[in-house]
From Swiss-Prot:
Mitochondrial glycine transporter that imports glycine into the mitochondrial matrix. Plays an important role in providing glycine for the first enzymatic step in heme biosynthesis, the condensation of glycine with succinyl-CoA to produce 5-aminolevulinate (ALA) in the mitochondrial matrix. Residues 98-126 are annotated as: Disordered. Solcar repeats lie at residues 10-93, 125-209, 235-319. Gene3D superfamilies: Mitochondrial carrier domain. Coiled coil: none annotated. GO terms for molecular function: glycine transmembrane transporter activity. InterPro entries: Hem25/SLC25A38 (IPR030847), Mitochondrial_sb/sol_carrier (IPR018108), Mt_carrier_dom_sf (IPR023395). This is Mitochondrial glycine transporter. Keywords: Membrane, Mitochondrion, Mitochondrion inner membrane, Repeat, Transmembrane, Transmembrane helix, Transport.
Length: 333
């Protein structure tokens, strides 16, 4: 294997590890909110206050709040790992095929200076490329992790009395077959692909705009010209986190109807067979409001979890990129 191949492999492995770590962290911290969202969405008559009352009535409060944390951490952790790895590969390829004009015109600025004045070391793409890359990467990750998603939702719900993940898996396999592990994938893909695509688009635009609104301190060079100084850890993390929250709020509002239908399909596949018929049934029996059940919970969780995952991931990659550049510089000496 050539040095270039080994370097590419190590970078892909690090993207996978960074995505895994950021996903697990956000999933575990925010599991109580996700649990409440599932309880609210499982039935049109289930309100937030009723869901909280059910959990408070449990013999042990903390285990009740973190019920389903293991499948959630596995799904979100490996989902983030697959997503960030595939997204990076797609964006790197897109950047080589169709680079932004600004990236090729900056001939007098070194690459290290360009990276240091930005809150991110990830490839810079057009809005369309960011949209398509995010959608494609999320669709792939969603398909691979769908069985864990079904197990997580069933385990969190009060409609099933599963005592363990193994018993849940055996029950689904016995009564629904392999198809049961992919219940709701259509609604999930329709929800997640646009969400992820729009998220990457708004996230990148947010970083760009916020970096302009809150620039780094300027420094004076030996030629008496001024330029942006290196962006520090706290400044970059603040911009990335704020951009992530804003993108998460916008995308959660747009995609919540698909999430509400998806949850019903996964919990009651016999009653809600697909996205179209499920949406019609929910609206016909409960009104349009049913499509917005759990919006506040989902919006708060998705905004914070996505922002946290992206901020941690970006910082790990920034540090790794700095190490890789330093190593490459030493090899050239």
């Amino acid at each position: 294997m050539s040095d270039g191949s080994r370097t590419a492999l190590s970078k892909s492995t690090f993207h996978f590890a960074a995505g895994l770590g950021s996903g697990v962290l956000s999933a575990v911290l925010l599991q109580p909110i996700d649990l409440l969202k599932t309880r609210v969405q499982q039935s049109g008559a289930h309100s937030l206050s009723a869901a909280i009352a059910d959990i408070r009535a449990a013999p042990r409060l903390l285990p009740a709040l973190w019920r389903g944390a293991v499948p959630s951490a596995l799904r979100t952790g490996f989902g983030s790992a697959i997503y960030f790895t595939s997204l990076n590969a797609i964006r790197q390829s897109a950047a080589r095929i169709s680079p932004l004009p600004s990236s090729s015109s900056s001939t007098t600025t070194s690459s290290s200076t360009t990276t240091s004045s930005s809150s991110s070391s990830l490839p810079k793409l057009s809005n369309t490329s960011n949209l398509l890359a995010g959608a494609a990467a999320r669709s792939l990750a969603g398909l691979i992790l769908m069985p864990l998603t079904v197990l997580k939702v069933r385990y969190e719900s009060t409609l099933y009395n599963y005592t363990s993940l193994a018993s849940a898996a055996r029950d689904i396999a016995a009564h629904e077959g392999a198809r049961g592990f992919f219940a709701g994938y259509g609604a999930t893909a329709v929800r997640d692909a646009p969400y992820a695509g729009l998220y990457v688009l708004f996230y990148e635009q947010g970083k760009k705009r916020l970096s302009q609104l809150f620039p780094t301190t300027t420094t004076t060079t030996t030629t008496n010209s001024t330029q942006n100084g290196p962006m520090g850890l706290q400044h970059a993390a603040s911009i990335n986190f704020a951009s992530g929250v804003l993108a998460g709020v916008i995308c959660s509002v747009v995609s919540n109807p698909f999430d509400a239908v998806k949850t019903r399909i996964q919990l009651q596949p016999g009653r809600y067979r697909n996205m179209v018929s499920g949406a019609r049934r929910m609206v016909g029996e409960e009104g349009v409001r049913a499509l917005w059940d759990g919006l506040a919970l989902r919006m708060s969780r998705k905004a914070v979890s996505s922002a946290l995952a992206w901020t941690v991931y970006e910082e790990l990659i920034r540090r790794a990129e700095a190490g890789w550049r330093a190593g490459a510089a030493r090899e050239r000496l």
